[in-house]
């Protein structure tokens, strides 16, 4: 099984945590979509990550991948059992992927971390302030109303909805923003519980190999962190904007 995508992406991080939780072996091609080659465009027509390749099957979109993994490898489920709970889980995941992902990635992580290095574009401080002072707190108010007082959203085992919330907020933390425990105590405690789980902490151990390592040393750094890096890559040396940035 091959996962195409950088482990710093919240959507890739979500899938890697699920693979770790399920005990599934995988190889990783740790590209960002901005450095995907023409073959990557064929795999992912929206030039988004992650992409899962399982034999001759290609699956795009982290939500679709998570559901495929739960159906194909059901021993350790990440979706709840009942129809009502599954619907709730899917909605929370959608909110996290869409709203939190938009704010944490495109509102914070991309302008502060990615754009200055890849596209030599300085951040717009007014736009950042709108996210950190208005939009993101509003989203966290909604999350706080649904955060579990103990354990996880659907019982004593972590699921995909928990990971969907935690993963983009991890990128916000890398960009310098974390939820204030005084304002969002349930959310902060819930995120802290998630951060202690081996399936999740293992993904965090991959971050320095991407964020603090030169491109020519990342393969060795990832392998030192326990990643089986794919022999061939869908990456290229020249960045290009994704469809979402055009």
Regions found by a protein language model. Name each.
Residues 1-130, 233-246:
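GST-like domain detector, emphasizing the conserved glutathione-binding G-site
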């Amino acid at each position: 099984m091959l996962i195409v995508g950088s482990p710093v992406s919240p959507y890739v991080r979500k899938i890697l945590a699920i693979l770790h939780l399920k005990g599934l072996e995988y190889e990783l091609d740790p590209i960002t979509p901005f450095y995907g080659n023409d073959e990557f465009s064929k795999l992912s027509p929206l030039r988004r990550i992650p992409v899962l390749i399982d034999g001759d099957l290609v699956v795009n979109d982290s939500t679709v991948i998570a559901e495929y993994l739960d159906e194909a490898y059901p021993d350790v489920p990440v979706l709840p059992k009942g129809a009502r709970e599954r619907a709730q889980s899917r909605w929370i995941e959608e909110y996290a992927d869409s709203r939190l992902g938009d704010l944490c990635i495109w509102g914070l992580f991309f302008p502060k971390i990615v754009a200055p290095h890849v596209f030599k574009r300085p951040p717009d401080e007014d736009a950042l302030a709108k996210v950190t002072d208005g939009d993101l707190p509003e989203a966290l108010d909604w999350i706080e109303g649904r955060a579990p007082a103990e354990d996880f959203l659907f019982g004593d085992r972590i699921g995909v909805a928990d990971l969907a919330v935690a993963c983009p907020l991890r990128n916000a933390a890398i960009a310098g923003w974390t939820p204030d425990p005084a304002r969002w105590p349930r959310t902060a405690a819930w995120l802290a519980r998630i951060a202690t789980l081996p399936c999740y902490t293992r993904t965090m151990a991959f971050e320095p190999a991407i964020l603090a390592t030169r491109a020519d040393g990342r393969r060795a750094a990832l392998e030192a962190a326990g990643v089986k890096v794919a022999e061939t890559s869908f990456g290229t040396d020249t960045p290009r904007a994704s469809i979402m940035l055009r």
